[in-house]
A protein has these predicted regions:
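Intrinsically disordered, low-complexity acidic Ser/Thr-rich regulatory segments
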Residues: 1-62, 74, 123, 127
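Buried hydrophobic-core signal for structured, non-transmembrane domains
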Residues: 69-71
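C-terminal boundary/linker segments immediately following FHA domains
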Residues: 2-12, 27-31, 73, 79-86, ...
């Protein structure tokens, strides 16, 4: 019987991003720029919203840096790091359980940690 590989993921609850993002890569770049592995918003979903709906979320979304954070996995342990577009940390911060992370320092993630990229919230599920 094949064992399913454990797969950490982020769970979102917004109309402009998929409900679940699987952390399949060793390094996942997160931010507002569409080139990121995980872009906030998911532009394919965002484009389908009405202009009024888009405008409703724009003020929150502009507080997510173009390159905001990075999640890496080493030896089965996941880490999150606040990067920022210039590499000096994001303007509106990355948070674990409401604690703001120091820029450019990897923090270990635990199952059910509540993460925030600026105002955008998600939950980290270890598997």
């Amino acid at each position: 019987k094949k064992r399913r590989k454990k797969m950490a993921r982020l769970i979102f609850d917004y109309p402009f991003i998929g409900r679940e993002y699987r952390l399949e890569k060793e390094t996942t770049m997160i931010g507002r720029a569409p080139e990121n592995d995980l872009s906030i918003p998911d532009y394919s979903m965002f484009r389908k919203m009405t202009l009024l709906e888009q405008r409703t979320y724009l003020s929150s979304l502009k507080n997510v840096s173009r390159i905001h954070a990075r999640i890496t996995v080493r030896g089965g342990q996941y880490f999150i790091e606040d990067i920022g577009t210039s590499g000096q940390g994001s303007n509106y911060g990355t948070f674990i359980n409401e604690i703001r992370l120091e820029a450019k320092k990897p923090y270990p993630l635990s199952d059910n940690d509540h993460l925030r990229f600026g105002p955008i919230e998600t939950v980290f599920m270890a598997e």
